[in-house]
């Protein structure tokens, strides 16, 4: 399993760049969140576009405002290593040993009252694809 290696300096730079890019590419980002949350938790989100991982980072910085981690495929981590700097850790679905290690890592973060983001579908899929499949 590839563990995160967070970099506060990189996160500040990415946050500024990402805010600029989101304003450039989206009319608005709207969040309907009337839940009364206490502490952090497990966030399960759809994975329908390449923006998703970056939106998770943005939402954590501007809405959740906590220490956050996200599960990402090993292949994706190897291809886009910068995600390590913002809290991504890997999972290799082809290795049951690594799946267990990744789930244990997520469990440890949750016990520390951190937020853990998971894309249960495992792959980028069209939002209307049915039936939903989980890795």
Which residues fall in each region the model found?
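Soluble catalytic domains of membrane acyltransferases
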Residues: 28-135
């Amino acid at each position: 399993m590839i563990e995160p290696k967070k970099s506060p300096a990189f996160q500040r730079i990415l946050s500024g760049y990402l805010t600029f890019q989101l304003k450039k590419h989206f009319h608005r980002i709207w969040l309907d969140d009337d839940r009364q949350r206490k502490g952090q938790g497990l966030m399960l989100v759809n994975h329908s576009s390449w923006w998703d991982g970056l939106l998770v980072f943005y939402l954590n910085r501007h809405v959740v405002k906590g220490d956050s981690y996200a599960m990402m495929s090993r292949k994706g981590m190897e291809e886009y290593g910068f995600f390590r700097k913002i809290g991504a850790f890997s999972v290799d679905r082809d290795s049951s040993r690594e799946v267990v290690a990744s789930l244990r890592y997520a469990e440890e973060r949750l016990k520390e009252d951190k937020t853990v983001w998971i894309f249960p579908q495992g792959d980028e899929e069209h939002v209307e694809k049915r039936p939903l499949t989980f890795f």
